[in-house]
Amino acid sequence: MSNATVDDMDENLVGPVIRAGDLADAVIDAVIADNPGKEVHVIERGDYVRIHTDRDCRLTRASIEQALGRSFVLAAIEAEMSSFKGRMSSSDSEMRWYYKS
């Protein structure tokens, strides 16, 4: 995981922008677990946190439930997500942000 500045953001980085707090912390842990071998970029900006990986970022319900220690409806992230970078697809079990030229 790295802390970078917005100026350092590569145009190929994708992922959610989440309100800071316990859920954001759990999303960071889950994104790290769901994207093995990828560098996870975390940029804290006061009230929100940018969580990005290069070209493809996965977040599974199983990983976020493990990070939170309780069951969780994945769609509830959308209420806490002020924005995202890239394209997004979602299902009951996974959210994915990806880069497509």
From Swiss-Prot:
Induction (free text): Induced during growth on aliphatic alkenes (such as propylene, ethylene and 1-butylene), epoxides (such as propylene oxide and 1,2-epoxybutane) and chlorinated alkenes and epoxides (such as vinyl chloride, cis- and trans-1,2-dichloroethylene, 1-chloropropylene, 1,3-dichloropropylene, epichlorohydrin, and epifluorohydrin). Repressed during growth on other carbon sources.
Organism: Xanthobacter autotrophicus (strain ATCC BAA-1158 / Py2)
GO cellular component terms given for this protein: cytoplasm
Name under which the protein is recorded: Alkene monooxygenase system, effector subunit
Keywords: Cytoplasm, Plasmid
UniProt family annotation: Belongs to the TmoD/XamoD family.
Lineage: Bacteria, Pseudomonadati, Pseudomonadota, Alphaproteobacteria, Hyphomicrobiales
Subunit: Monomer. The alkene monooxygenase multicomponent enzyme system is composed of an electron transfer component and a monooxygenase component interacting with the effector protein XamoD. The electron transfer component is composed of a ferredoxin reductase (XamoF) and a ferredoxin (XamoC), and the monooxygenase component is formed by a heterohexamer (dimer of heterotrimers) of two alpha subunits (XamoA), two beta subunits (XamoE) and two gamma subunits (XamoB).
Subcellular location: Cytoplasm
